[in-house]
């Protein structure tokens, strides 16, 4: 895991990043700015249990590309999940919390992930581990309201104007952050296009 100091506010931004692109970098930049992050851990996962491995580029390649895309020095590109041997986000976050009890973590996800978030293993446990910042993505601005996560944890929503103090909230707590959006999509890039209305 990247090094962090006691009291730091650290964003956790996980994904396959297959490939990483400027849309991911934009989400990271918005999160750093709006959440007042000291660091953002760009967590490149060895694999995604919900996605096919057939088109998954080698981890080393995705790490190198992520380093190229993530220019901000506060972004720490890492693949520590491979070392931990964890495949599921809930297990990874539990390990992160246990190893860093004095760091304030926020889980960061694109709004397009909310529609399937309830299919993640122990998804409600994830929501109860760290506060969550959902960053707007093209095509997901309105659909996030109908997501199972938004309905289940509607009581825990924090106003976007208070995003900068989300780290002070006890989970479950989440906020939806609007901002500039990129139409870039890893799926579209893999399929030979650079834009997708769906992601």
Curated annotation (Swiss-Prot):
Top EC group: transferase
Coiled-coil segments on the chain, per record: none
Pathway linked to the protein: Cofactor biosynthesis; NAD(+) biosynthesis; deamido-NAD(+) from nicotinate D-ribonucleotide: step 1/1
UniProt keyword terms in alphabetical order: ATP-binding, NAD, Nucleotide-binding, Nucleotidyltransferase, Pyridine nucleotide biosynthesis, Transferase
Record-linked CDD domains: NMNAT
Gene Ontology MF, one: ATP binding
Catalysis: reaction(s): nicotinate beta-D-ribonucleotide + ATP + H(+) = deamido-NAD(+) + diphosphate
SUPFAM superfamilies: Nucleotidylyl transferase
Catalytic activity, EC: 2.7.7.18
Keyword Flavoprotein among UniProt keywords: no
Family in the record: Belongs to the NadD family.
Described function: Catalyzes the reversible adenylation of nicotinate mononucleotide (NaMN) to nicotinic acid adenine dinucleotide (NaAD).
Protein name: Probable nicotinate-nucleotide adenylyltransferase
